[in-house]
């Protein structure tokens, strides 16, 4: 997983949590 990256879904976060508010991986 990684954090701080832009995302639209958890798939784009390598299954990390994707914040829908900021659209970033956390």
UniProtKB/Swiss-Prot annotation:
Intrachain disulfide bonds: 7-18, 13-25
Main location: secreted
Localization terms from the record: Secreted
Tissue: Expressed by the venom duct.
An example Gene Ontology molecular-function term: toxin activity
GO cellular component: extracellular region
Key words, A-Z: Disulfide bond, Knottin, Secreted, Toxin
Family from the record: Belongs to the conotoxin O1 superfamily.
Further facts: This peptide corresponds to allele E1j. Has not been merged with other alleles since they may differ due to geographic variation (see strain in PubMed:19606224).
Record remark on domains: The presence of a 'disulfide through disulfide knot' structurally defines this protein as a knottin.
Designated name of the protein: Conotoxin Eb6.17
Gene name tied to this protein: E1
């Amino acid at each position: 997983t990684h954090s701080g990256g832009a995302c639209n879904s958890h798939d784009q976060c390598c299954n990390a949590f994707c914040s829908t508010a900021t659209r970033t991986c956390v």
